[in-house]
Amino acid sequence: MQKIKIIIASDSVGETAEQVAKACVSQFNSKNFKSEIVRYPYIETIENVDEVIEIAKENELNIVVFTLVKPDIKQYMEERLAENKIKHVDIMGPLMSILTDKIDEQPYCEPGIVHKLDEAYFKKIEAIEFAVKYDDGKDPKGLPKADIVLIGISRTSKTPLSQFLAHKRYKVMNIPIVPEINPPEALFEIDPKKCIALKISEEKLNKIRKERLKQLGLGDSARYATGQRIQEELEYFDNIVNKIGCPVIDVSDKAIEETANDIMYIIEQNKTNKSE
């Protein structure tokens, strides 16, 4: 019975090449030969390549299947394989060459980038689920876990901002500030720099609330939209903000995207300052 060793060489984990090798082997009658798939991940130096070549030279039936994207390592691998007459398959090279010609753009040549993309996707999903779970101050336990905490009175776009930022992979919790309800104590215990207060002008808020009442089929004379009630809420909001000592963004005449960009700038600046 023939014994064939398929050597997987990759500058990342080697999962792609191994899956291709397994798919190919499964197409043959395993009674006629015995195959062994050996994975050599994280090929980063010419010494790593030499190790693969030495293993491959042990048997003329051995095959090297590689996914290497760093040009210098890939070229060295191809030269060593050719000079030793080792059968080999470049999984990614041919397609990357065609894509380069077709779209007239050079590839990143960065190992493991597909896993980074997967990680980014799952972080986004996690952030979206977080925003839903902790929307409208549902559970104070979310405060220490949040990357960003938004506070503001009603109609300051807390929920849409939370969702927008979640799609940017930030875990966001929002808490409504209402005079009749004390904010959770944990709000005053978190880092104030990750808390963003959303401020709105009295005139703008009055207009928004009256429009909201119309949509609900109610008269615009409800206390919810009166100047006295709005002033009361804004004063209470200012007191809470002063107690926390957090940054404030005026959302009166801003689109969601613009406010979100301001929030991300503040948060990222704080991260930069912390690392210095």
Swiss-Prot record:
Record protein name field: Putative pyruvate, phosphate dikinase regulatory protein
Known catalytic reactions: N(tele)-phospho-L-histidyl/L-threonyl-[pyruvate, phosphate dikinase] + ADP = N(tele)-phospho-L-histidyl/O-phospho-L-threonyl-[pyruvate, phosphate dikinase] + AMP + H(+); N(tele)-phospho-L-histidyl/O-phospho-L-threonyl-[pyruvate, phosphate dikinase] + phosphate + H(+) = N(tele)-phospho-L-histidyl/L-threonyl-[pyruvate, phosphate dikinase] + diphosphate
Entry's family note: Belongs to the pyruvate, phosphate/water dikinase regulatory protein family. PDRP subfamily.
Entry EC number(s): 2.7.11.32, 2.7.4.27
Keyword Nucleotide-binding (UniProt): yes
Residues given in the record as ADP binding sites: 152-159
Keywords assigned by UniProt, alphabetized: Kinase, Nucleotide-binding, Serine/threonine-protein kinase, Transferase
Organism annotation: Staphylococcus carnosus (strain TM300)
Enzyme class, UniProt record, top EC level: transferase
Function noted in UniProt: Bifunctional serine/threonine kinase and phosphorylase involved in the regulation of the pyruvate, phosphate dikinase (PPDK) by catalyzing its phosphorylation/dephosphorylation.
GO molecular function terms listed in the Swiss-Prot or TrEMBL record: ADP binding; ATP binding; phosphotransferase activity, phosphate group as acceptor; protein serine/threonine kinase activity
